[in-house]
C-alpha cells in the first residue's frame, strides 16, 4: 500500500525537478536586478550603460522592456515566461533584459524621450550591444487571442538576436 503513495510523489518530483527548471533557477540567480524587476527608484540611464556593457561582454543584444508594477500585461508576460522555460532561456541567453519602470511616481521622462513612442504596455525595444536601436515592438504582436504565443516569442527572439544584427541593420537601411 505504501508503494502506491510513493509512485505519484516520485512522479511529481521528477516533473518539478526537470533540467529546464534548474536552468531557469540558475539563469534567474545570475541576472542583474534591472533584469528582474520594475523599480521606480532605479536610474534607467545607469542601468542601460550596465546592460550594454554586459551585452558587449557576452555578445548579446539588449531587450528594453517598458512597463511597471501597475501593468497587468507585464505580470501576464512574466507569468508566461515562468511557465515556458524554453522561451525564458532563449530570452536570457540571447538578450540582456533591461526593465524600465514608468509610473505615476516616476515616468522616467528623460529616458523615455530618447526612445520611439510607446504604443502600449509592456512595450519592448531591441538595441545592439553598441546601443543602436533596431526595433520598437508592441507586445500585442506576440499574442494569440488573449495569451502570449510561445511560437511568436521564439520567432521574435530568434529574429532579433545578436547573430542576426548585420542582416537586421541592412534591412533597416533598405526600408
Locate each region found by the language model.
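Typically the conserved alpha-helix immediately C-terminal to a functionally engaged Cys/Sec
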Residues: 75-90
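Non-catalytic, surface beta->alpha helical segment in thiol-disulfide oxidoreductase systems
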Residues: 118-172
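Short active-site neighborhood of thiol/selenol oxidoreductases, capturing the structured segment around
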Residues: 58-69
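Bacterial N-terminal signal peptides that target proteins for export
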Residues: 1-9
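Thiol-based oxidoreductase modules, predominantly thioredoxin-like and allied folds used
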Residues: 42-45, 87-107
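Bacterial N-terminal signal peptides
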Residues: 8-17
